[in-house]
Amino acid sequence: MAKISKRVAKGREGIDRNRFYPLDEAVKVIKERATAKFDETIEVAMNLGVDPRHADQMVRGVVNLPNGTGRSVRVAVFAKGDKADEAKAAGADIVGAEDLVETVQKGEINFDRCIATPDMMPLVGRLGKVLGPRGLMPNPKVGTVTTDVAAAVKASKGGAVEFRVEKAGIVHAGVGKVSFDENAIAENVRAFADAVIKAKPSGAKGNYLKRVSITSTMGPGLKIDPSTLAAS
Protein backbone atom coordinates (compact mmCIF):
# COMPACT_ATOMS: atom_id res chain seq x y z
CA MET A 1 0.00 0.00 0.00
CA ALA A 2 1.34 3.43 -0.94
CA LYS A 3 2.39 5.58 1.98
CA ILE A 4 0.28 8.70 2.53
CA SER A 5 2.28 11.90 2.88
CA LYS A 6 1.95 13.99 6.03
CA ARG A 7 0.42 16.83 4.01
CA VAL A 8 -2.26 14.56 2.52
CA ALA A 9 -2.95 12.96 5.90
CA LYS A 10 -3.35 16.39 7.49
CA GLY A 11 -5.72 17.44 4.72
CA ARG A 12 -7.95 14.46 5.49
CA GLU A 13 -8.12 15.12 9.23
CA GLY A 14 -11.63 15.80 10.43
CA ILE A 15 -13.25 14.81 7.13
CA ASP A 16 -16.37 12.69 7.60
CA ARG A 17 -16.40 10.43 4.55
CA ASN A 18 -19.92 9.23 5.32
CA ARG A 19 -21.43 12.70 5.50
CA PHE A 20 -23.16 14.51 2.64
CA TYR A 21 -21.98 18.11 2.96
CA PRO A 22 -24.04 21.14 1.95
CA LEU A 23 -22.31 22.59 -1.12
CA ASP A 24 -21.34 25.92 0.46
CA GLU A 25 -19.76 24.17 3.46
CA ALA A 26 -17.94 21.70 1.21
CA VAL A 27 -16.43 24.54 -0.81
CA LYS A 28 -15.24 26.21 2.38
CA VAL A 29 -13.62 22.98 3.61
CA ILE A 30 -11.95 22.29 0.25
CA LYS A 31 -10.45 25.77 0.16
CA GLU A 32 -9.19 25.46 3.74
CA ARG A 33 -7.54 22.08 3.02
CA ALA A 34 -5.79 23.18 -0.20
CA THR A 35 -2.15 23.48 0.84
CA ALA A 36 -0.26 22.77 -2.40
CA LYS A 37 2.23 25.34 -3.65
CA PHE A 38 0.20 25.91 -6.81
CA ASP A 39 -3.34 27.06 -7.54
CA GLU A 40 -5.20 23.77 -7.32
CA THR A 41 -8.12 23.00 -9.61
CA ILE A 42 -11.55 22.40 -8.11
CA GLU A 43 -13.00 19.19 -9.56
CA VAL A 44 -16.61 18.01 -9.48
CA ALA A 45 -17.63 14.42 -10.24
CA MET A 46 -21.21 13.26 -10.74
CA ASN A 47 -22.13 9.57 -10.71
CA LEU A 48 -25.13 9.09 -12.97
CA GLY A 49 -27.65 6.29 -13.31
CA VAL A 50 -26.90 5.69 -16.99
CA ASP A 51 -25.12 3.10 -19.11
CA PRO A 52 -23.31 5.03 -21.87
CA ARG A 53 -22.91 1.82 -23.87
CA HIS A 54 -26.49 2.50 -24.97
CA ALA A 55 -26.93 5.41 -27.38
CA ASP A 56 -30.11 6.60 -25.64
CA GLN A 57 -28.24 6.92 -22.33
CA MET A 58 -25.33 9.07 -23.53
CA VAL A 59 -24.84 12.30 -21.59
CA ARG A 60 -22.85 15.11 -23.15
CA GLY A 61 -23.03 18.86 -23.49
CA VAL A 62 -21.32 22.14 -22.83
CA VAL A 63 -21.81 24.74 -20.12
CA ASN A 64 -20.51 28.27 -19.80
CA LEU A 65 -19.34 28.65 -16.21
CA PRO A 66 -20.38 32.09 -14.89
CA ASN A 67 -16.98 32.70 -13.30
CA GLY A 68 -14.73 30.97 -15.82
CA THR A 69 -12.38 28.06 -15.18
CA GLY A 70 -9.31 29.99 -14.11
CA ARG A 71 -7.14 28.22 -16.66
CA SER A 72 -5.66 29.42 -19.91
CA VAL A 73 -7.31 27.57 -22.80
CA ARG A 74 -5.57 27.21 -26.15
CA VAL A 75 -8.10 27.11 -28.98
CA ALA A 76 -7.55 25.74 -32.49
CA VAL A 77 -9.92 26.58 -35.33
CA PHE A 78 -10.25 24.85 -38.68
CA ALA A 79 -11.47 27.55 -41.06
CA LYS A 80 -10.67 29.39 -44.28
CA GLY A 81 -11.03 32.92 -45.64
CA ASP A 82 -13.20 35.34 -43.69
CA LYS A 83 -13.99 32.74 -41.04
CA ALA A 84 -10.29 32.22 -40.41
CA ASP A 85 -9.89 35.98 -40.01
CA GLU A 86 -12.83 36.09 -37.58
CA ALA A 87 -11.30 33.30 -35.51
CA LYS A 88 -7.96 35.10 -35.29
CA ALA A 89 -9.65 38.37 -34.33
CA ALA A 90 -11.59 36.57 -31.58
CA GLY A 91 -8.37 35.29 -30.03
CA ALA A 92 -7.91 31.79 -31.45
CA ASP A 93 -4.40 30.50 -30.78
CA ILE A 94 -4.13 28.33 -33.90
CA VAL A 95 -6.05 28.78 -37.16
CA GLY A 96 -5.63 26.72 -40.30
CA ALA A 97 -7.11 24.32 -42.83
CA GLU A 98 -5.19 21.64 -44.76
CA ASP A 99 -1.98 22.79 -43.08
CA LEU A 100 -3.47 22.33 -39.61
CA VAL A 101 -4.78 18.89 -40.56
CA GLU A 102 -1.25 17.86 -41.54
CA THR A 103 0.13 19.23 -38.28
CA VAL A 104 -2.37 17.26 -36.20
CA GLN A 105 -1.76 14.09 -38.22
CA LYS A 106 1.90 14.36 -37.20
CA GLY A 107 0.80 14.24 -33.57
CA GLU A 108 1.38 17.91 -32.89
CA ILE A 109 -1.62 18.83 -30.75
CA ASN A 110 -0.89 22.05 -28.93
CA PHE A 111 -4.44 23.05 -28.03
CA ASP A 112 -7.13 22.30 -25.45
CA ARG A 113 -10.25 22.90 -27.54
CA CYS A 114 -11.00 22.50 -31.23
CA ILE A 115 -13.55 24.34 -33.38
CA ALA A 116 -14.40 23.91 -37.06
CA THR A 117 -16.68 25.50 -39.62
CA PRO A 118 -19.13 23.02 -41.23
CA ASP A 119 -17.37 23.15 -44.61
CA MET A 120 -14.14 21.98 -42.96
CA MET A 121 -15.61 18.81 -41.44
CA PRO A 122 -14.84 16.53 -44.43
CA LEU A 123 -11.18 17.38 -43.80
CA VAL A 124 -11.39 17.33 -40.01
CA GLY A 125 -13.19 14.00 -40.16
CA ARG A 126 -9.88 12.39 -41.12
CA LEU A 127 -8.61 13.28 -37.67
CA GLY A 128 -11.22 11.31 -35.74
CA LYS A 129 -8.77 8.67 -34.51
CA VAL A 130 -6.42 11.39 -33.28
CA LEU A 131 -8.82 13.95 -31.83
CA GLY A 132 -11.62 11.63 -30.72
CA PRO A 133 -9.80 9.80 -27.90
CA ARG A 134 -8.63 13.17 -26.57
CA GLY A 135 -12.15 14.60 -26.50
CA LEU A 136 -11.16 17.25 -29.04
CA MET A 137 -13.25 16.28 -32.06
CA PRO A 138 -15.52 19.19 -33.10
CA ASN A 139 -19.20 18.40 -32.63
CA PRO A 140 -22.26 20.49 -33.53
CA LYS A 141 -24.07 19.25 -30.40
CA VAL A 142 -21.64 21.16 -28.18
CA GLY A 143 -21.22 24.18 -30.43
CA THR A 144 -17.77 23.40 -31.78
CA VAL A 145 -18.95 22.93 -35.37
CA THR A 146 -20.34 26.33 -36.24
CA THR A 147 -20.26 29.24 -38.67
CA ASP A 148 -20.08 31.66 -35.73
CA VAL A 149 -16.46 30.92 -34.96
CA ALA A 150 -15.92 34.20 -33.12
CA ALA A 151 -18.59 33.37 -30.53
CA ALA A 152 -17.29 29.82 -30.17
CA VAL A 153 -13.73 31.01 -29.60
CA LYS A 154 -14.83 33.58 -27.02
CA ALA A 155 -16.96 30.98 -25.21
CA SER A 156 -14.04 28.54 -25.10
CA LYS A 157 -11.71 31.21 -23.78
CA GLY A 158 -14.27 32.53 -21.32
CA GLY A 159 -15.24 29.42 -19.39
CA ALA A 160 -17.02 26.96 -21.65
CA VAL A 161 -16.66 23.43 -20.28
CA GLU A 162 -17.52 20.41 -22.38
CA PHE A 163 -18.64 17.27 -20.56
CA ARG A 164 -19.25 13.68 -21.57
CA VAL A 165 -20.17 10.65 -19.47
CA GLU A 166 -17.49 7.98 -19.13
CA LYS A 167 -17.94 4.21 -19.21
CA ALA A 168 -18.56 3.99 -15.47
CA GLY A 169 -21.39 6.53 -15.68
CA ILE A 170 -19.30 9.39 -14.30
CA VAL A 171 -19.19 12.98 -15.55
CA HIS A 172 -16.47 15.22 -14.19
CA ALA A 173 -14.95 18.62 -14.87
CA GLY A 174 -12.70 21.29 -13.47
CA VAL A 175 -14.93 24.14 -12.33
CA GLY A 176 -12.46 26.70 -11.02
CA LYS A 177 -9.40 27.25 -8.87
CA VAL A 178 -8.97 27.31 -5.09
CA SER A 179 -7.99 30.97 -5.46
CA PHE A 180 -11.59 31.76 -6.47
CA ASP A 181 -13.81 33.06 -3.69
CA GLU A 182 -16.32 30.62 -2.21
CA ASN A 183 -19.35 32.12 -3.94
CA ALA A 184 -17.68 31.96 -7.36
CA ILE A 185 -16.83 28.28 -6.90
CA ALA A 186 -20.33 27.43 -5.67
CA GLU A 187 -21.91 29.28 -8.61
CA ASN A 188 -19.75 27.34 -11.05
CA VAL A 189 -20.56 24.01 -9.40
CA ARG A 190 -24.28 24.74 -9.54
CA ALA A 191 -24.06 25.80 -13.20
CA PHE A 192 -22.23 22.60 -14.09
CA ALA A 193 -24.63 20.38 -12.12
CA ASP A 194 -27.64 22.12 -13.67
CA ALA A 195 -26.29 21.52 -17.18
CA VAL A 196 -25.67 17.83 -16.48
CA ILE A 197 -29.14 17.42 -14.99
CA LYS A 198 -30.75 19.13 -17.99
CA ALA A 199 -28.79 16.79 -20.28
CA LYS A 200 -30.58 13.75 -18.82
CA PRO A 201 -31.11 11.37 -21.76
CA SER A 202 -34.45 9.84 -22.69
CA GLY A 203 -33.18 6.35 -21.96
CA ALA A 204 -32.20 7.08 -18.34
CA LYS A 205 -34.34 5.11 -15.89
CA GLY A 206 -34.59 5.28 -12.11
CA ASN A 207 -32.29 7.51 -10.06
CA TYR A 208 -30.37 9.73 -12.52
CA LEU A 209 -28.20 11.67 -10.07
CA LYS A 210 -26.67 9.02 -7.81
CA ARG A 211 -23.78 10.87 -6.17
CA VAL A 212 -21.90 14.17 -6.38
CA SER A 213 -18.47 14.86 -4.96
CA ILE A 214 -16.02 17.74 -4.93
CA THR A 215 -12.27 17.86 -4.43
CA SER A 216 -9.18 19.88 -5.25
CA THR A 217 -6.14 18.58 -7.15
CA MET A 218 -4.30 17.49 -4.01
CA GLY A 219 -7.09 17.68 -1.45
CA PRO A 220 -9.67 15.34 0.09
CA GLY A 221 -12.91 14.42 -1.62
CA LEU A 222 -16.26 15.36 -0.07
CA LYS A 223 -19.70 14.02 -0.93
CA ILE A 224 -22.28 16.72 -1.65
CA ASP A 225 -25.91 16.81 -0.54
CA PRO A 226 -27.68 16.98 -3.94
CA SER A 227 -30.52 19.05 -2.48
CA THR A 228 -28.06 21.94 -1.98
CA LEU A 229 -27.10 22.11 -5.65
CA ALA A 230 -30.12 24.18 -6.67
CA ALA A 231 -29.47 27.90 -7.05
CA SER A 232 -30.66 29.74 -3.96
Curated annotation (Swiss-Prot):
Q: Which superkingdom is the protein from?
A: Bacteria
User: What sections of the protein cross the membrane?
Assistant: none
What does this protein do, in the record's words? Binds directly to 23S rRNA. The L1 stalk is quite mobile in the ribosome, and is involved in E site tRNA release. Protein L1 is also a translational repressor protein, it controls the translation of the L11 operon by binding to its mRNA.
Task: State the encoding gene.
Answer: rplA
Q: How does it assemble?
A: Part of the 50S ribosomal subunit.
Q: State the name under which the record lists this protein.
A: Large ribosomal subunit protein uL1
**Keywords assigned:** Repressor, Ribonucleoprotein, Ribosomal protein, RNA-binding, rRNA-binding, Translation regulation, tRNA-binding
Range of residues in the leader sequence: none
Tell me the GO molecular function terms: rRNA binding; structural constituent of ribosome; tRNA binding
Protein's GO biological process: regulation of translation; translation
Q: Which InterPro entries does the record match to this protein?
A: Ribosom_uL1_bac-type, Ribosomal_uL1, Ribosomal_uL1-like, Ribosomal_uL1/biogenesis, Ribosomal_uL1_3-a/b-sand, Ribosomal_uL1_CS
| GO CC aspect terms | cytosolic large ribosomal subunit
Per the similarity annotation, which family is this?
Belongs to the universal ribosomal protein uL1 family.
Q: Entry's HAMAP family?
A: Ribosomal_uL1_B (MF_01318_B)
